[in-house]
From Swiss-Prot:
It comes from Macrococcus caseolyticus (strain JCSC5402). InterPro entries: DNA_mismatch_repair_MutS (IPR005748), DNA_mismatch_repair_MutS-lik_N (IPR007695), DNA_mismatch_repair_MutS/MSH (IPR017261), DNA_mismatch_repair_MutS_C (IPR000432), DNA_mismatch_repair_MutS_clamp (IPR007861), DNA_mismatch_repair_MutS_core (IPR007696), DNA_mismatch_repair_MutS_N (IPR016151), DNA_mismatch_repair_MutS_sf (IPR036187). HAMAP family: MutS. The keyword Nucleotide-binding applies. This is DNA mismatch repair protein MutS. This protein is involved in the repair of mismatches in DNA. It is possible that it carries out the mismatch recognition step. This protein has a weak ATPase activity. Keywords: ATP-binding, DNA damage, DNA repair, DNA-binding, Nucleotide-binding. Transmembrane segments: none annotated.
Length: 846
C-alpha cells in the first residue's frame, strides 16, 4: 500500500481521535466515510459502497450535506455515534489542504433539534459507584438535570423509569450488572472526566462525581459551553410509588410486551395531551405515582374541575393546540442554537397565555399544582414587533425582521429590492436590444451576475457590438458580463451582504433579550404541561366513563365494577364484564382459581392499574373506588426465559417473587400469577403455599394470587386473611363458556382440555388427554381416599412422606405427566409437534 494522500492523512488523524464514532468527513457538498466506517455506514443506511484510490482500494461512501440529517438520525436510532468534521475554510480561497475540525459529536443521548421525538424526553445518564450508586441524568434539549443516590436494585428500577438513550460511566461495572443495564439501553460508554469541562456548582460533594461526569461528556460532545444546564436538582424516589422494572413491564405501563411500543399500554389511553410538554409529563406521571395524599387529591380536584366544566376544557384544549414546545424552545435559546422560526413558534405560544390565564382566573384555588401563570407580555410584544411570521430557519440568510422594526434594515432592504428591480428592467431591455427573447440574467457565487444566451441564438448575434464580454462557456449556452452590470453588482451585493450581516446581529440581540426571560419561560412550560395533563385526564375520564376515586386514609381497597382500562377499549361497548375487589385488614389475600383464558390475569392487572391511575391523579374505570396509598406494587405475571442473562423461566419467576417477598410491606400490593409452573407439581405446590403463608403471616400485603393448584383452596380454612375467589365458566353441550365474572369460592375444574380444544389442538390429542385425565383423577381419588387436603403449614415443603415408596413413585409419575400436559405451549405447537408430544406422553405411560 502506498503512502496516504495529505487529505487521507488528515482523515486518519481525526479518526484516531474519535475511534468510537462514525466520522462524517466534509468534502465539498458531501460527507464522506472511509475504511470500516464506510462499510458499516453503507450496510446500515443501505447506500452504495464504492472505492477511492484504486491503487489502495479504500472503501468509501457518502451522503449529501444538505440531507445528512436524515442519515445521521438513522444511525443514531441504531445506537451509533457520529462525529461531524467540517471544512473550516473556503476551498476556493485556500491553496493546499483545507483545514477541517470535528465540530460536534452526535450520540443517542445528546441529540438535539428535530432528530428526537417531541413527545418523549431524551435522557442521557451517568452512573457512579462508591458505597452506593449515584445516578445523574439530563435531557440536553431542555437543560433538565436531576441526580439521586440509590442501592443497585433501586438504581436499576430508576433507570427503567428514566429510560435513558445512553449511559456514561467511568468505572468498571461487573458483567451481571451490565447485562441488567442492557435490558434498558444498549448504549453504554466509558468516559473519563476532564478538568477543563464544566463542573457542577451547588451540588453535594457526594453527588459531584456523577454530575461532573455527565456534564463533562455532554460538553465534550457538544464542544461548547452548557449555559442551559444551570441547575442539578436532587430528588429521592421514595416520594413516589415504587414500581420495579418487572411491574412496569408486566403491567405494560408505557411499552407493550409483544410489540415494544405504546400500542396496548396505559400510556396509549392517556395519550390525549395537546402539547409536547404534556405528553412527556404524562409518561412521567404514569411511571411515578404519588405517595402524598394531598398532592394526589389536588390532581383529582383539577380533573374534576375540567369534568364539571366542559366548555372550559374545550376552550383550554383549543388554546393548547396552538402552543409549541416552550420547554425545548427555551433550551435552544439558552444553548444558542435557536432559529428565527423557533422564536416565531415561541411568539405563537405566548399568544395563548392571556387566554389560558383568563380561563383559569376563577379557579386558582382548584389548580393548586400551578405556580403563577404569567403571560410574559413584554416578551410577546417584542417578538410580535420584530419577527416576520414566515421567518426562515437559517439566521444568516436574512428575511427575519419586519419592515419598520429597524431603520437601517429598511434602508438596506430598499437598496437591495431596487437593485433586483433594476436587474429585471435590464433583462427586458437586453432582450429587446438583442432580439433574443430567451436571454436571462442569472447569478452564482463564482461569477456574480451574468447574461446568459443559448448557443442557438448566438449564431447570428455579434456580441461584441453589444459590449458583451464572454465569461463562461456551457454545453448549450454562453455567459457574458458588461461594465454596467458589474457596476450595479457591487451596489446590489453590497446592500444584500450588509443587510444579512445586520439582521444576524439584530437576531443575536433579540436572542439575548429572550434569555432574560428564561426562568419564567421554563416555569410557564411546566404550568402548561401540568394543565395539559389534567385536561387530558378529564378528556379520557369523560370518554371512557371513569369516576373520581376516594383516597382512603385506611388500608381498605374497595373497587366496584372495575374494568381493565386498555382491554375494554378493544371490545364492543358494554361487552366488558366488570368485577369487584374488596381487600382490607381482615381479608387481604385473594386466592384466585379458574380456567385458562377465563380472565384471571386481566382481573389482577386491572386492580393494579386502577391503583396506579388513582395515585397518579387520574380517574379510574369503575363505578366506585376507595383506594389506599400503596407504597409499592410487585408483579409476577407471565413466563419468559431471560435470554440476556441465560436464566430459565422458573429462575426468572423465583427472582421476581424474591424481589416482592423481600421488599413488600403491609402497604404494598402483590400480584402473583401461577407461581410454581416451571417445576414439578409438588415443588410448585409447596413453593406456592409457602409464599402465601409468608405473605399472610410475615408481610400482610394486599395480594392477588392466581393458581392452578386446587389443593391450595383449603388454605382459606387456616389463614384468616385469605379468601377464595374464582373466575366463572360453565360447560354447555360439551363446550366451555367463559363468563369472566369473579365469584366467591374456588372453581371445581381447570378446564385445561377444553381450552386446548378451543385452541384447535388435534382431535386425537384432545381425546387421548381426556382419557388420561379421567384415569389420573380416578387414581388421585383412590390415593387420597377421596379427600383433598392441603399440605399442613408445619409440613416440610420439599419432602413427600409416603409409606409405600413404589406407590408414591407411580403417583408422582402421574403428576409429572399431568404437569407435562399442562405445560404444553399451545400457541407455539404445530400439528406435527403435537403428535410427537402425544407419542412422548404415551411412551411415559407405558
Amino acid at each position: 500500500m502506498s503512502k496516504p494522500t495529505p487529505m487521507m492523512t488528515q482523515y486518519l488523524q481525526m479518526k484516531e481521535q474519535y475511534k468510537d464514532c462514525i466520522l462524517f468527513f466534509r468534502l465539498g457538498d458531501f460527507y464522506e466515510m472511509f475504511y470500516e466506517d464506510a462499510e458499516l455506514t453503507a450496510k446500515e443506511l443501505e447506500i452504495t459502497l464504492t472505492r477511492r484510490d484504486k491503487k489502495n482500494n479504500i472503501p468509501m461512501c457518502g451522503v449529501p450535506h444538505h440531507s445528512a440529517k436524515v442519515y445521521i438520525e438513522r444511525l443514531i436510532e441504531k445506537g451509533y455515534k457520529v462525529a461531524i468534521a467540517e471544512q473550516m475554510e473556503d476551498p476556493k480561497q485556500v491553496k493546499g489542504m483545507v483545514k477541517r475540525e470535528v465540530v460536534k459529536i452526535i450520540t443517542p443521548g445528546t441529540v438535539m433539534d428535530d432528530m428526537i421525538s417531541e413527545n418523549e424526553s431524551n435522557y442521557i445518564a451517568s452512573i457512579h459507584h462508591e458505597e452506593g450508586f449515584t445516578l445523574a441524568y439530563s435531557d440536553v434539549s431542555t437543560g433538565e438535570l436531576k441526580v439521586t443516590q440509590l442501592n443497585e436494585d433501586e438504581m436499576l428500577n430508576e433507570l427503567s423509569s428514566v429510560n435513558p438513550k445512553e449511559i456514561i460511566t467511568n468505572i468498571d461495572l461487573n458483567e451481571v450488572l451490565i447485562n441488567k443495564i442492557k435490558m434498558i439501553t444498549d448504549v453504554i460508554s466509558r468516559f473519563e472526566v476532564n478538568d477543563t469541562f464544566k463542573q457542577a456548582d451547588g451540588v453535594d460533594q457526594s453527588l459531584q462525581p456523577a454530575v461532573n461526569l455527565l456534564l463533562s461528556y455532554i460538553q465534550y460532545t457538544q464542544m461548547r459551553a452548557l449555559a442551559h444546564i444551570d441547575e442539578a436538582v436532587y430528588y429521592e424516589p421514595v416520594h413516589y410509588m415504587r414500581l420495579d422494572m418487572y411491574a412496569k413491564r408486566n403491567l405494560e405501563l408505557t411499552e407493550s410486551i409483544r410489540h415494544k411500543n405504546k400500542k396496548g399500554t396505559l400510556l396509549s389511553i392517556f395519550n390525549q395531551c395537546k402539547t409536547p410538554m404534556g405528553n412527556r409529563l404524562v409518561k412521567e406521571w404514569i411511571e411515578r405515582p404519588l405517595l402524598n395524599r394531598q398532592e394526589i387529591e389536588e390532581r383529582h380536584n383539577g380533573v374534576e374541575l375540567f369534568n364539571d366544566n366542559f366548555i372550559l376544557r374545550h376552550q383550554l384544549r383549543e388554546a393548547l393546540t396552538h402552543v409549541y414546545d416552550i420547554e425545548r424552545l427555551a433550551g435552544r435559546v439558552q444553548f444558542g442554537n435557536v432559529s428565527a422560526k423557533d422564536l416565531v413558534q415561541l411568539k405563537y405560544s405566548l399568544e395563548q397565555l392571556p387566554m389560558i390565564q383568563s380561563l383559569l382566573k376563577e379557579h386558582d384555588e382548584v389548580i393548586r399544582t400551578l405556580d403563577n401563570i404569567d403571560a410574559l407580555q413584554p416578551l410577546y410584544d417584542m417578538l410580535e414587533a420584530s419577527l416576520l411570521d414566515e421567518a426562515p430557519t437559517s439566521i444568516k440568510d436574512g428575511g427575519i425582521f419586519k419592515d419598520g422594526f429597524n431603520n437601517d434594515v429598511d434602508e438596506l432592504r430598499y437598496a437591495s429590492k431596487n437593485g433586483k428591480q433594476w436587474l429585471n428592467e435590464l433583462q427586458a431591455k437586453e432582450r429587446e436590444r438583442t432580439g433574443v427573447k430567451s436571454l436571462k440574467i442569472g447569478y452564482n457565487k463564482v461569477f456574480g451576475y451574468y447574461i446568459e444566451i443559448s448557443k442557438a441564438n448566438l449564431v447570428n448575434l455579434d456580441v461584441d457590438a453589444f459590449g458583451y464580454t464572454r465569461k463562461q462557456t456551457l454545453s448549450n449556452a454562453e455567459r457574458f458580463i458588461t461594465e454596467e452590470l458589474k457596476e450595479k453588482e457591487s451596489l446590489i451585493l453590497g446592500a444584500e451582504e450588509k443587510l444579512m450581516n445586520l439582521e444576524y446581529e439584530l437576531f443575536i440581540q433579540l436572542r439575548d433579550f429572550v434569555k432574560t426571560f428564561i426562568l419564567n419561560l421554563k416555569q410557564q412550560a411546566k404550568n402548561i404541561a401540568v394543565l395539559d395533563c389534567l385536561q387530558n385526564f378529564s378528556e379520557v375520564a369523560t370518554k371512557h366513563q371513569y369516576i373520581k376515586p376516594i383516597i382512603s386514609g385506611t388500608k381498605v381497597l374497595n373497587i366496584e365494577d372495575a374494568r381493565h382500562p386498555v382491554v375494554e377499549t378493544v371490545m364492543e361497548r358494554d361487552q366488558y364484564v366488570a368485577n369487584d375487589c374488596k381487600l382490607d385488614d381482615h381479608t387481604f389475600i385473594y386466592l384466585i382459581t379458574g380456567p385458562n383464558m377465563s380472565g384471571k390475569s386481566t382481573y389482577m392487572r386491572q386492580v393494579a392499574l386502577i391503583s396506579i391511575m388513582a395515585q397518579m391523579g387520574a380517574f379510574v374505570p369503575a363505578s366506585y373506588a376507595e383506594v389506599p396509598i400503596f407504597d409499592q406494587i410487585f408483579t409476577r405475571i407471565g413466563a419468559a426465559d431471560d435470554l440476556v442473562s441465560g436464566q430459565s423461566t422458573f429462575m426468572v419467576e423465583m427472582l421476581e417473587a424474591k424481589n416482592a417477598l423481600q421488599n413488600a410491606t403491609d402497604n404494598s400490593l402483590i400480584i402473583f400469577d401461577e407461581i410454581g409452573r416451571g417445576t414439578s407439581t409438588y415443588d410448585g405446590l409447596s413453593l406456592a403455599q409457602s409464599m402465601i403463608e409468608y405473605v399472610h403471616n410475615k408481610i400482610g400485603a394486599k395480594t392477588l394470587f392466581s393458581t392452578h393448584y386446587h389443593e391450595l383452596v383449603d388454605l382459606e380454612q387456616t389463614l384468616d386473611g385469605l379468601n377464595n375467589i374464582h373466575v366463572a365458566a360453565k360447560e354447555y353441550n360439551g363446550e366451555l363458556i367463559f363468563l369472566h365474572k369473579v365469584m366467591p369460592g374456588a372453581v371445581e375444574h381447570s378446564y385445561g382440555i377444553h381450552v386446548a380444544k378451543l385452541a384447535q389442538l388435534p382431535a386425537e390429542i384432545i381425546e387421548r388427554s381426556s382419557e388420561l385425565l379421567d384415569e389420573f383423577e380416578h387414581n388421585e381419588k383412590v390415593r387420597k381416599g377421596d379427600s383433598n387436603k392441603i399440605i399442613q403449614p408445619s409440613f416440610n415443603l420439599f419432602e413427600i412422606e409416603n409409606e409405600n415408596t413404589n406407590k408414591y413413585n407411580a403417583n408422582h409419575e402421574h403428576d409429572l405427566i399431568i404437569q407435562q400436559i399442562k405445560d404444553i405451549s399451545i400457541d407455539e405447537l404445530t400439528p406435527i409437534e403435537a403428535l410427537l408430544k402425544l407419542q412422548e406422553i404415551k411412551s411415559r405411560i407405558k
